[in-house]
Amino acid sequence: MAKRVLIVDDDPAQRRILEGCIKRFGLESKTAASGDQALHILTGPEKDDIALVLLDLVMPGTGGMAVLEQLRGRPGSPPVIVQTAHGSIDGAISAIRAGAIDFVVKPASPERLEVSINSALKLQALSGEITR
């Protein structure tokens, strides 16, 4: 089974763009339109199918930072790459401190996303080897 990336963004156009990129990278995707929907997936029966999360920070309701806070320290949580149109250094630092593995500013180039995703998946695989 191909690795599945959970795309979490309230903007349907952004979700479609990211789905296309993920497919070109040879990965499968699943989408969530809100932080609540993402948490439902990441804590439900599908959680083991998700290898990585691409998470928008600014969404109505449960935002990206709240999702990160709820996932922090949870065993088996996939790596999270956060993305936002508000590329402040403070936002990036806060996201990394909250548990994100990387931070990209929208619109991110497909090349930048691919490097970030591949790095996160490799790091996750190495972490899995260490804990075995």
How does the language model describe each region?
Residues 31-52:
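Acidic, metal-coordinating helix/loop segments flanking the phosphotransfer/catalytic sites
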Residues 34-37, 62-66:
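Acidic catalytic/metal-coordinating carboxylates
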Residues 40-43, 65-76, 94:
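Short amphipathic alpha-helix used as the core "switch/output" element in two-component signaling
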